Amino acid sequence: MKIVEKLYLCDDNALRLMDKQLRYNDFSNFLSEYFPHKVQKISLNAGFTCPNRDGVKGYGGCTYCNNQTFNPAYCRTEKSVTQQLEEGKQFFERKYPQMKYLAYFQAYTNTYGELERLKSMYEEALSVDGVVGLVIGTRPDCMPDSLLDYLEELNKRTFLLVEYGIESTDDEVLRRINRGHSFACSAEAVERTAMRGIKSGGHIIIGLPGEAYTHGTPDERKEALNVMCDRLSALPLTTLKLHQLQLIRGTRMAHEYEQNPEECKRYTADEDIDVVIDCVERV
């Protein structure tokens, strides 16, 4: 569903929320605490892969994944980080000439590589005119201490948000979608990141096959959803992104759905909104 595609929950900023009559802190409010001007994320594809794609932890990647479905046209690995950012800027500058930007390392696992290569790409992005910070999307099992050492230093001189793909708090669901890590791994990564003073975000997909809150009686579904929210609330997350499940043609999950449609709950728009509201109220 596209009604609520992404929702961020952030701490503090209560007065601003009251002024806007919001019951949660959205991402734009969160950014306004750090920047006096409008800020836009620009997605990047820096040519990384994932350990559940290259054989280290498995093959094929996550069963729902097809990065090309959300990457902008300019995100091509044959283009440098700088070129991708400049092309992304051109799109927004037509409407907002004073816009500033966050370089969003989004595609695949953006901490999965040699430390010097990672540092070079991050620093290249920060050198582009108008870029005022980084958002780095990654997996919880791809954050070595050596990289955290560097990110801790980087965090002292620029805006930095590390966004972890948690996806589910249920280990059986994580196994089913071929994530290759546990929820405990996610919790540990978030805690280690927060201990360094680095802002961390969590990404959750609502409605994955096998989630307990997608089946059973209404009371059973609500209780299962509360369990997930309580697990997330216990983490020292700065932001939380809730994303609806999308079945993309050609993915393994789409094939599984074609074979056994009853195994995957397809929410209506109203049901999707109700689940998000329940999550917001709980966390």
Regions found by a protein language model. Name each.
Residues 1-63, 67-102:
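N-terminal [4Fe-4S]-dependent radical SAM core
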Residues 68-88, 92-115, 130-143, 159-186, ...:
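Core AdoMet radical
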Residues 82-89, 118-123, 148-152, 186-190, ...:
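Generic structural signal for well-ordered alpha-helices
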Residues 93, 122-129, 151-159, 191-195:
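Acidic (Asp/Glu)-rich catalytic clusters
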Residues 206-217, 238-267:
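Flexible glycine/acidic-rich beta-alpha junction loops that bind and position SAM and/or redox cofactors
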Residues 210-232:
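Catalytic cores of alpha/beta
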Residues 263-283:
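C-terminal accessory regions of radical SAM enzymes
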